[in-house]
Swiss-Prot record:
Coiled-coil region: none
Stored Gene3D superfamilies: Winged helix-like DNA-binding domain superfamily/Winged helix DNA-binding domain (1.10.10.10)
Gene Ontology CC terms, in alphabetical order: host cell cytoplasm
Function, in words: A DNA-binding protein that is part of the type III partition system presumably used to ensure correct segregation of this bacteriophage. Binds to tubC (centromere-like site) DNA upstream of its own gene in a sequence-specific fashion (consensus TTGAC); binds to multiple sites in the tubC region, probably spreading from an initial site. Upon binding to tubC forms flexible loops over about 1 kb of DNA that forms 2 rings, covering tubC and the promoter region. This probably shuts off transcription of the operon. DNA is both bent and untwisted by TubR.
SUBUNIT field: Monomer; probably dimerizes when bound to DNA. Binds to TubZ when associated with tubC DNA.
GO molecular function: DNA binding
Keywords annotated in UniProt: DNA-binding, Host cytoplasm, Plasmid partition
Protein name (database record): DNA-binding protein TubR
Keyword match Manganese: no
Miscellaneous: This bacteriophage also exists as a circular plasmid prophage in its host.
Compartments, record wording: Host cytoplasm
A GO biological process held by the record: plasmid partitioning
Gene: tubR
Main location: host cell
Length: 81
């Protein structure tokens, strides 16, 4: 599965904000606000990243799901930079 520039932007945002644990994770809304991407783009990207194991679901924030970057996701970023 190919990853595009907008999708890499999401991984970069998670890594730059140290979202690497279940407790330190971002909601879809937070990712949209920081990355300036649409909600549908963020949701589609997160779904792909979950399948690729680049992100995992963190602790819920109220009723909202949160997500953090995994070691696999960090390795993927290192491989392209």
């Amino acid at each position: 599965m190919a990853v595009n520039k907008n999708e890499y932007k999401i991984l970069i945002m998670l890594k730059e904000n140290q979202c690497t644990t279940e407790l330190k994770s971002f909601t879809y809304t937070k990712l949209c606000n920081i990355s300036k991407l649409s909600m549908s783009t963020v949701r589609r990207s997160i779904k792909k990243f979950l399948e690729l194991q680049y992100v995992k679901e963190g602790c819920k924030q109220g009723i909202s799901k949160t997500f953090y970057i995994t070691p696999n996701g960090i390795e993927k970023l290192k491989s392209i930079m």
